[in-house]
Amino acid sequence: MIRVAINGYGRIGRSILRAVYESAKRDRIQIVAINELAKPEAMLHLTQYDTTHGRFHTQVKLDEQHMIIGDDAIKLLHEPNPANLPWQEMDIDIVFEATGVINDRQACEAHIEAGARQVLISHPSSSDVDATIVYGVNQDLLKAEHTIVSNASCTTNCIVPVIDVLDRHFQVKSGAITTIHSAMNDQQVIDAYHDDLRRTRAAGQSIIPVDTKLARGIERILPHMKDKFEAISVRVPTINVTAIDLSVTLDKRVDIEQVNRVLKQATEGSFSGVVGYTNEPLVSCDFNHDPRSSIVDGTQTRVSDGHLVKLLLWCDNEWGFANRMLDTSLEMIKARRA
C-alpha cells in the first residue's frame, strides 16, 4: 500500500480520488491527505456531486478535520505554502501535484523538503524534472532516484501511444494535429477579461482557438520525432471528452485495413487497457468516464495516396488522465523499491 496526498482538489484532483475508489487499485493506493484552499463544505459537495461524472458511489461526509469515505479518514489541509505541509509526519510516498500552477522542479521540491518521497505532476512541466512519462510508452525510464516526475498532458497521453504504434510498423515521417478539446475552467462563462483575447469570449458560444505545446510534448516522449509534428487546438462548447484529428505521412505504403488492423492489435496486446479501438458509430459523450488514454475510431480512418493517413482519436481528458496518474504512481514506487 502506498500513501499519497493530493495537492490541489480541482477537476483532476477530484478525478484522481474518484479513480482510486472506483478501481482495483484501491488496495494498493491510500489517499492520506488533500491540501486545498477551498472550504471543506465545498470540497465535500463537489466530491459527492459531479456534473460530468455523476454522484459519488460511496457515502462521503466531514468531521472537524477529515473527509470520511467509507472507513477512510482523509485529512483536509488548507496550506498555501507546500513547504509547510506535514508530509513527513504523514509518511507520504507520493504527492499528486494537481494545482495546475506548480510545474517546475524548484516549486515541486517544496513537497520533498516537507517530507514527501516523490512528486507526480498532473500536467506538463519544465524540462528539469527527472522524467516525463506517458504510461504504456516510456514508464521503463523511471529510476529509483527519480523524485519529481511529470505525467505529461491528457492530449499527449492520447496521441503518443498511437504515434508510437504507427512509427514502429510504418515509420512516421511527419504529422499535423488538431485537438478538439472540451471547454476548461480557464475560459469565461460570459465575455470577461483574460490575457488571451480569444479566451475573453464566452466558452459556451464559440469554437475558440488556443495555444498548444502538444507537438513539443510529443518530442519529449519520442525524441526522434523532433520537428516532425505541428499542432493546433480549439476549445468547443462541451464540458468533457476530447477528439484529436491526427494526420501523419508514413514512409511505407498502407491502406485503411492495414492501419486499422495494426492499431486494433496494439489495443489487444501491449496497449491493452491504455488504448482502445471501436468501429461503432459513437459520439463524444459515449467516451465520458472512459479510463483509457485513447480510443481509435476505426470508422474515421482515411488514407490518401497510400502514405497520408488521417485518424480520429477520442479520450476523456479528465478520467483517462486521472487513471494514468494512478498507473504512473505505481510504476514510480516499483522503480524506487526495485
Swiss-Prot record:
- Using the record for this protein, list the coiled-coil segments as residue ranges, or answer none: none
Q: Which residues form the active site?
A: 154
Keyword Nucleus attached: no
Q: What Gene Ontology terms describe what this protein does at the molecular function level?
A: erythrose-4-phosphate dehydrogenase activity; NAD binding; NADP binding
The record lists substrate as bound by 153-155, 199, 212-213, 235
Per UniProt, NAD(+) binds at: 11-12, 317
Annotated pathway, please? Cofactor biosynthesis; pyridoxine 5'-phosphate biosynthesis; pyridoxine 5'-phosphate from D-erythrose 4-phosphate: step 1/5
Note the CDD domains from the entry: GAPDH_C_E4PDH (cd23937), GAPDH_N_E4PDH (cd17892)
The yes or no answer to whether the keyword NAD is present is yes
Q: Name one GO biological process term.
A: glucose metabolic process
- UniProt main location, coarse: cytoplasm
| Its biological purpose | Catalyzes the NAD-dependent conversion of D-erythrose 4-phosphate to 4-phosphoerythronate.
The subunit structure is:
Homotetramer.
Which NCBIfam families does the record cross-reference, listed alphabetically?
E4PD_g-proteo, GAPDH-I, PRK13535.1
| Protein family per UniProt | Belongs to the glyceraldehyde-3-phosphate dehydrogenase family. Epd subfamily.
Q: What is this protein called?
A: D-erythrose-4-phosphate dehydrogenase
> Which species?
Shewanella piezotolerans (strain WP3 / JCM 13877)
Q: What is the lineage of its organism?
A: Bacteria, Pseudomonadati, Pseudomonadota, Gammaproteobacteria, Alteromonadales
Q: Which gene encodes it?
A: epd
